[in-house]
Amino acid sequence: MQVDFYYYSYQCPLNYNMLRLLSECKDIELNTYDIAQKPELAEKMQMYFPTLTIINGNTRRYSPITAGFIEELKAGRVPKERPFCPKNGTKPAQGRLVSIGANNIEKACLCCGSPCAESAVCKAKFLKLHGEESFGYMLLDGKKALLGGAEYLPSLSVPYSVPKDEETAFITCCYLTDEEYDCKSAPLSALERSLAEKYSRVTVISDEKGVFPNGNMEFSLLHGYQDEGIVYEDENYCRLHLMSKQI
């Protein structure tokens, strides 16, 4: 079984865990490609997610790699992938908004599930390369548990094939999804207010139905983003749109 794993450095803390899982599996022919400084490769692979896994040279997989997925590959099976389309809650989540920086990035990394100090350290180092003190906002409840968050990078920094200039910021991820509560709107709005001090436009990639990693297209439209058209389509998984908003 051959696996070609494309990833955007440690923009997503799960990338650290996935690279470790893959490296520990000796039964797979593995090739890894960091697209952080390779926009031409990201464009060639039509990549708009933090990771892209190609199995046996032809099967694309977008969602995170797990130990269970590795076991399936070792058994000679390619698991079928389904888009992540949970119900989006509409009741505003209540909590405290906190700026995300290198000093508290480990808390934000909990959006990916199980905590991993090493992955948080890798993400903090990755973010520091961009010279920003704040990378977004997270919403915490009264017990300081993570409810949701929104993060960005300067558009000039991202390898994806999206509009890039000094006036444009790019939303890299917007989380978490709950069936009752809306945990994403508050941190996204806080981030937009902060970005308006430096940028005039913000862009994001949204799927028509799936919520990973930025919320679906309906969520973006509700927040005033305009549809700039389809940038990529996989009939088995996603139809991605570039969305933009003047701020």
Describe each model-derived feature in a short phrase:
Residues M45-Y48, F126-M138, G148, F170:
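A short helix-loop-beta-strand connector motif used in the catalytic cores of GNAT acetyltransferases and
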Residues T172-C183, E208-K209:
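A short, internal acetyl-CoA/4′-phosphopantetheine-binding micro-motif in the GNAT/acyltransferase core
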Residues E180-A196:
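Conserved acetyl-CoA-binding loop-helix of GNAT-fold acetyltransferases
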Residues K209-G229:
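Conserved active-site alpha-helix within GNAT-family acetyltransferase domains
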